[in-house]
Regions:
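Conserved beta-loop-beta/alpha segment of the NTase-like Rossmann-fold superfamily
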Residues: 103-105, 113-116, 123-214, 257-258
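Aromatic (phenylalanine/tyrosine) cluster motif
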Residues: 25-27
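Catalytic-core segments of class I nucleotidyltransferases/pyrophosphorylases
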Residues: 166, 180, 184, 188, ...
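Residues at the starts of beta-strands that form the adenosine-phosphate
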Residues: 45, 90-92, 137, 192-193, ...
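N-terminal glycine-rich phosphate-binding loop and ensuing alpha1 helix
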Residues: 37-118, 143, 179-180
Length: 330
């Protein structure tokens, strides 16, 4: 099936169901096999919502998308992609914007740059650049009129493969692929959607979606009876918040198409998942790996420092950082 054709059809369907803010679906690049993946039940696609303007990082984000800002020497979005690749994903969908062309440039091949690096003897970096998108596909769709996370995920409906897919928020960096792999395994076992969870102090729940467990948690997995977006502290059903990792069955798009504005006047993904849970199982998996929230400059700096010290995705910088700290102690 023509990918562009799929985009046009999806655009029309979403428009008829009230998502008129979707201006276009643009398939920018394709790496690897040119065949659509059909007939597979595996979770193969990652959707990354990346259309936001990154206003907390202005003026830097006026020119450089926040998702491309480096943690060590690796763009934040690449760390999110690497996590998914380690869990078996091979199709990356970026929900971007025409105002952020640098995202498209990052995924575009640069054979001229690779040749220059090899001529200078830097084969390691040339190989690293060549590997971006070499063994996985990249689709880029545009969300020109952002109306919330539910709306952003809906924009990807035209290019999602398979029966279920992953959504990863690029503001949240995880320490490895084990957590996401476990979420995918639970989705495969239950044939239902799965949300990532983390327990927090009850005073923090008002900033997140919060789940109401339907049973006791076993081995980090719990059946979810209900969920609420940004509840008041005294109305929160638990202290288990939803973090930026989801594994969703594709019928979530039916619920997204029916969304009306919720919290903050936006189309909330939480509301779509809640509606889906009325007719299919929903589970949560509590994270067992490090998690960094890079949504603020302070959080971004914390992630860069801690990941360097721990060696999580930031190779070779830990010793340099320790030397800097020691110099300033004296």
């Amino acid at each position: 099936m023509c990918v562009l054709g799929k985009c046009i059809i999806a655009k029309r369907l979403l428009h008829l169901n009230g998502l008129s803010g979707v201006n276009e679906f643009v398939y920018v690049s394709w790496h690897g096999s040119s065949q659509d993946i059909v007939g597979h039940v595996e979770v193969r696609t990652l959707v990354i919502p990346a259309a936001g303007l990154g206003t907390r990082f202005l003026p830097a984000t006026k020119a450089v998308p926040k998702e491309l800002m480096p943690i060590g020497d690796t763009p934040a979005i690449q760390l999110v992609i690497d996590e998914a690749l380690g869990a078996g994903i091979d199709h990356i969908v970026i929900v971007g914007s025409s105002a952020k062309p640098a995202l498209e440039q990052y995924f575009a091949a640069r054979p001229d740059l690779e040749r220059m690096l090899r001529a200078k003897g830097n084969d390691a970096m040339a190989d690293r650049l060549a590997s971006i998108g070499r063994d996985w596909r990249v689709s880029i769709v545009h969300q020109e009129d952002p109306k919330g996370l539910g709306h952003a995920v809906g924009c990807a409906s035209s290019v999602v493969d398979g029966d279920a897919f992953v959504v990863s928020l690029p503001d949240e960096i995880m320490g490895g692929s084990r957590f996401l792999q476990k979420m995918i395994d639970v989705c495969t076992t239950t044939s239902g959607s799965v949300v990532g969870l983390m327990e927090v102090d009850r005073s923090e729940v008002l900033a997140y979606g919060v789940v109401a467990p339907e049973a006791e948690m076993v081995d980090g997995v719990v059946k979810v009876g209900d969920l609420v977006e940004k509840p008041a502290i005294d109305e929160a059903p638990s202290s288990l918040i939803i973090i930026g990792r989801y594994v969703l069955t594709v019928d979530i798009f039916e619920e997204i198409a029916q969304l009306t504005p919720g919290a903050a006047g936006e189309l909330q993904l939480t509301d779509a998942i809640r509606a889906q849970a009325q007719r299919s199982p929903l589970h949560g998996v509590e994270t067992m790996v490090n998690r960094w929230d890079t949504g603020t400059p302070a959080g971004f700096l914390t992630a860069a420092v801690e990941m360097a010290l721990l060696g999580d995705g930031v190779e070779g910088l830990g010793s340099d950082l320790r030397d800097i700290v020691e110099r300033h102690r004296s």
